Amino acid sequence: MSNVLELKIPASTANLGVGFDSIGMALDKFLHLSVKETSGTKWEYIFHDDASKQLPTDETNFIYHVAQQVAAKYSVDLPNLCIEMRSDIPLARGLGSSASALVGAIYIANYFGDIQLSKHEVLQLATEIEGHPDNVAPTIYGGLISGYYNDVSKETSVAHIDIPDVDVIVTIPTYELKTEASRRALPQKLTHSEAVKSSAISNTMICALAQHNYELAGKLMQQDGFHEPYRQHLIAEFDEVKTIASQHNAYATVISGAGPTILIFSRKENSGELVRALNRNVVTCHSELVDINVSGVKERIVYQ
């Protein structure tokens, strides 16, 4: 009899415009992993979606690499594993696919290495590997989270924000935009006054969300100075999507993570017509309504 670890890991959207590398929200698109020990001589992978089939099956596989990294940190050996994978999180689109895989890898190492990590420790590990908590924190906990990683003390602090009472639309282009390429578009330095201005906007936006003032929050989400002005030109459809969203009185249109996916906070009474208008007019993308995920990663052990 072998135990199967089943994981359902949500997607995430980072930044919400002005919360660069610090704010993220979990979404109901999922990476599904089913993991069990194998009698083979190496790790095995079974992919059930076309996008995952492009992933490596050797030791360069990201999940394998992270799981072994975690196992080594806690001085445990992992058995050879068979991982079945199905994902509806598009790769390299700004929806946290790498963060979902990272969290999955930590859970795999934790279970098959019998490490007994708490969720807090999972967060610390994930952020240390990722470098910032904006995707991994909501992936682990669900909901909308603001966080800070101190790279000196290696400590991550997070705070939960009320789930926004808005409809969320994602407009997903057909092309990829690697995070590394998107980061190269950013300036190396900001002036002190620029940093103060952007920080003030971000702080006020969070307060507006906490007060459920979505008019103000949306207005501020679109005034980022940290990354949006330098990345929007990488997404050919951004201006058209923002124009259509504005015509439907949306609260905000921003880049999801590093892009190229575009995130819209919509009024609930307008979201259906808005998503249909986007699909009619922006034919190089697929737009869809996505629920905010409130539970984070789900783990289940199946006994066979």
Swiss-Prot record:
Pathway terms, separated by semicolons: Amino-acid biosynthesis; L-threonine biosynthesis; L-threonine from L-aspartate: step 4/5
InterPro entries tied to this protein: GHMP_kinase_C_dom, GHMP_kinase_C_sf, GHMP_kinase_N_dom, GHMP_knse_ATP-bd_CS, Homoserine_kinase, Ribosomal_Su5_D2-typ_SF, Ribsml_uS5_D2-typ_fold_subgr
Protein name as it appears in the record: Homoserine kinase
Entry similarity comment: Belongs to the GHMP kinase family. Homoserine kinase subfamily.
GO CC annotation, single: cytoplasm
Catalytic activity reported: L-homoserine + ATP = O-phospho-L-homoserine + ADP + H(+)
Cell compartments where the protein resides: Cytoplasm
Binding site for ATP: P90, L91, A92, R93, G94, L95, G96, S97, S98, A99, S100
Swiss-Prot/TrEMBL keywords: Amino-acid biosynthesis, ATP-binding, Cytoplasm, Kinase, Nucleotide-binding, Threonine biosynthesis, Transferase
Function: Catalyzes the ATP-dependent phosphorylation of L-homoserine to L-homoserine phosphate.
One GO MF term: homoserine kinase activity
Root EC class: transferase
Keyword Cytoplasm: yes
EC number: 2.7.1.39
Single GO BP term: threonine biosynthetic process
